[in-house]
Regions:
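Alpha/beta-hydrolase fold catalytic core
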Residues: 1-15, 35-38, 73-76, 221-225, ...
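Conserved alpha/beta-hydrolase catalytic His-Asp/Glu region
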Residues: 116, 131-188
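Conserved HGGG/HGGXW glycine-rich cap/lid loop of the alpha/beta-hydrolase fold
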Residues: 6-52
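Catalytic active-site module of serine/aspartate enzymes centered on a nucleophile-bearing elbow/loop
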Residues: 224-255
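Conserved serine/cysteine hydrolase catalytic core
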Residues: 165-220, 225-228
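Active-site loop/oxyanion-hole signature of alpha/beta-hydrolase fold enzymes
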Residues: 32, 41-81, 85, 246
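Flexible "cap/lid" loop of the alpha/beta hydrolase fold
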Residues: 92-95, 102-134
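Short beta-to-alpha linker loops that shape the active-site pocket of alpha/beta-hydrolase fold enzymes
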Residues: 44-49, 110, 232-233
């Protein structure tokens, strides 16, 4: 599968992989900062953004898509930053193709299994009738009955676009994502391990990575460190971009 990407800057390749229901647009501001030091590739994963849609959606597929992208673009000594779903993709890639990697940054996700917790979001998204919706504000009103958090709704609505004149739609493939949602929480294979220098960055207010995850992180990633962005939740890179950038660029530039 040929993935869509935006490429900024020159130098060692740094790939950024978004989370579930996200897209490359979400990372543009930070990508411009990284581009002062690296050749930054902001990638749309399959079933997201401007990348192709497919029925298959698992971390093996997402990792293999990334592998194909790296080979097609003749990249090596790669640094990967992956958030949430993108972090899981990055972990799977790291244990499958370590020879292509230089460093790894995993943002607010651990290698463990996560129970399905997107039910209300998917229910709300499925209820949207695009034949009658004429604006994002109308969609937001409908979604508010299912998703209380305003910032979550606005994040989802960023993927809404004019498919054709008078016809709104989402860029993500809701049908495939909802069908395969059980794969999203999958754990890394118990035997998988990676010695690549790895930074796990978690939000201090997030419950995605907790103290109990640390042993598992160090089991799979033997050269890992864990840092916290305080007063930040799951979208720590959006909530505290300056602190997030400082922590990650320091790691990227270290030897």
């Amino acid at each position: 599968m040929k993935l869509y990407s935006r490429i900024l800057g020159k130098g060692q390749p740094l790939l950024i992989i978004h989370g579930l229901f996200g897209m490359s647009d979400n990372w543009q501001s930070l990508a411009k900062l990284y581009a002062d030091y690296f050749e930054v590739h902001i990638i749309d994963q399959r079933n997201h953004g401007r990348s192709p849609h497919a029925d298959e959606f698992s971390y093996i597929h997402l990792s293999n898509d990334l592998h194909q992208y790296i080979l097609e673009n003749h990249l090596n000594d790669v640094i990967i930053i992956g958030h949430s779903l993108g972090g899981k993709t990055a972990m799977q890639f790291a244990v499958s193709y370590p020879e292509l990697l230089s460093k790894l940054i995993i943002v607010d996700i651990s290698p463990r299994f996560y129970p399905i917790h997107h039910d209300k979001i998917i229910e709300g998204l499925k209820i949207l009738d695009f034949s009658n919706l004429k604006s994002r504000s109308q969609a937001d009103t409908v979604l508010s009955d299912y998703i209380e958090e305003y910032d979550v709704r606005q994040f989802l609505l960023k993927s809404m676009y004019w498919k054709e004149k008078g016809q709104l739609d989402f860029r993500f493939n809701l049908k495939s994502i909802s069908k395969n949602i059980s794969n999203v929480g999958a754990a890394l294979n118990d035997e998988a391990n990676c010695s690549i220098p790895t930074l796990f960055v978690k939000g201090g207010n997030s419950n995605y990575v907790n103290d109990d995850d640390e042993d598992l992180i160090f089991k799979h990633f033997t050269n890992a460190e864990i840092q916290t962005v305080e007063q930040a939740g799951h979208w720590l890179h959006a909530e505290k971009p300056e602190e997030f950038f400082k922590k990650t660029i320091r790691f990227c530039l270290s030897y």
